[in-house]
Each structure stands twice: as C-alpha cells, then as structure tokens.
Curated annotation (Swiss-Prot):
Residues 18-53 are extracellular. Residues 1-17 form the signal peptide. This is Small integral membrane protein 7. The gene is smim7. It is found in: Membrane. Residues 75 are cytoplasmic. Disulfide bonds: none annotated. One of its GO terms (cellular component) is membrane. Its main location: membrane. It comes from Siniperca chuatsi (Mandarin fish). The keyword Cell membrane does not apply. It is a single-pass type I membrane protein.
C-alpha cells in the first residue's frame, strides 16, 4: 500500500517536471487586471514552473525510489 503511494507520487512529480509546454501568463486586456487575485490556473502554472528547477533533486529521488523498490518492496 505505501509502496503504491510512493510510486504514484513519484510518477506524478516526474510528469510535472518534464512538461515542456510554454507556460506563460495571460496578457492583460485592460485596466484593473493587475489587482485581481491569481486564479487556480495561474497557481498550477507557477507550481509546474517551479518543478522544472528541481529536476536534479527529482532525479535523485527517482534513484532512491528505485533502490527502495529493490531492497524494501521486493520479494
């Protein structure tokens, strides 16, 4: 059970880290757009952009998970 959750979380973070889409903010269309609160899409976009900076740590985490799969979760 815990092994499945670790694999699920690892795959989810990997998918977010390797996205190569151009994630840009929407251009402001008029007056008053600067004062609005960030939307959910903006928050997701910022999170995915921040994941790109942690690719080295994500790679190390993958190696750790592979080690755990062999040593701890293997039969």
């Amino acid at each position: 059970m815990i092994g499945d959750l670790l694999i699920f979380g690892t795959l989810l973070v990997n998918a977010g880290a390797v996205l190569n889409f151009k994630l840009k903010r929407k251009e402001s269309q008029g007056f008053g757009d600067e004062s609005r609160a960030p939307a959910t899409g903006d928050n997701i976009r910022e999170f995915l952009l921040s994941l790109r900076y942690f690719r080295v740590f994500i790679a190390l985490w993958n190696i750790f998970i592979m080690f755990c799969m062999i040593v701890l979760f293997g039969s």
